[in-house]
């Protein structure tokens, strides 16, 4: 499966975050894509990354911010 991976900046008080960078990610499942995306966020050289959003077929299937449980 192909996913659009959006690397997100720090969320504001309302929980909205700007997209810093867009990437494409290939994975067999949403869970595998989420694990890979989390590793990208935690080890990325892109400054200001606080989380990510995974999109498949135009729909958000997962999102995560540093400090959240899961993945």
Feature roles, as predicted:
Residues 28-46:
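A short, charged, amphipathic alpha-helix used as a generic interaction element across diverse proteins
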Residues 15, 35, 64:
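Short acidic, gly/pro-rich beta-turn/loop elements at beta-sheet edges
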